[in-house]
Swiss-Prot record:
Belongs to the GrpE family. It comes from Listeria monocytogenes serotype 4b (strain CLIP80459). The keyword Aminoacyl-tRNA synthetase does not apply. Participates actively in the response to hyperosmotic and heat shock by preventing the aggregation of stress-denatured proteins, in association with DnaK and GrpE. It is the nucleotide exchange factor for DnaK and may function as a thermosensor. Unfolded proteins bind initially to DnaJ; upon interaction with the DnaJ-bound protein, DnaK hydrolyzes its bound ATP, resulting in the formation of a stable complex. GrpE releases ADP from DnaK; ATP binding to DnaK triggers the release of the substrate protein, thus completing the reaction cycle. HAMAP family: GrpE. This is Protein GrpE. Coiled coil: none annotated. GO terms for molecular function: adenyl-nucleotide exchange factor activity; protein homodimerization activity; protein-folding chaperone binding; unfolded protein binding. It is found in: Cytoplasm. Pfam families: GrpE (PF01025). GO terms for cellular component: cytoplasm. Homodimer. It comes from the Bacteria. CDD domains: GrpE (cd00446).
Amino acid sequence: MSEKKNKKERLADEIEQEELNILDETEETVEEEAAADTLTEEQAKILELENKLDEVENRYLRMQADFENVKKRHIADRDASQKYRSQSLAQDLLPALDSFEKALATTSDQEEVKQILKGMEMVYNQILVAFEKEGIEVIPAVGEQFDPNFHQAVMQDSDENAGSNEITAELQKGYKLKDRVIRPSMVKVNQ
């Protein structure tokens, strides 16, 4: 009987040992799974942070490019403003210049009138020199081909000596500031 009892005790010890082994293995598996879950969560967090970093870097680069574009546009606007700063003044002076031209077109035999006209011509020439310094110039007209960008046709002519679409007379001078037309020339164009 004692052998049976020993066998039972050994068997019970073996079962208990087996249960402990299984319990240990289960605990190890749970710990490994927990560690794997933690690792997976950390990897997911790292991936999420990397994506956010990429997004922020892209936004930064776009903002930097936008800033550069605004800067270039500002410089271009400032340059254009500087380039065409005298346009308004020139437009205001053109009627006075036209009046000078009409006055200078008159003739007189009186010495006083001739002296006044000479003084007016000097003032007129000074205005033209000031215009030239600012880049304002007369648009060529008579003998040129009609260009709707620079000329405004107000009359037609039928001169056999002039070519087709050639300007035969200028009724009012046109002016341009650098590459911008301030006032187109009013012209008579041959058919």
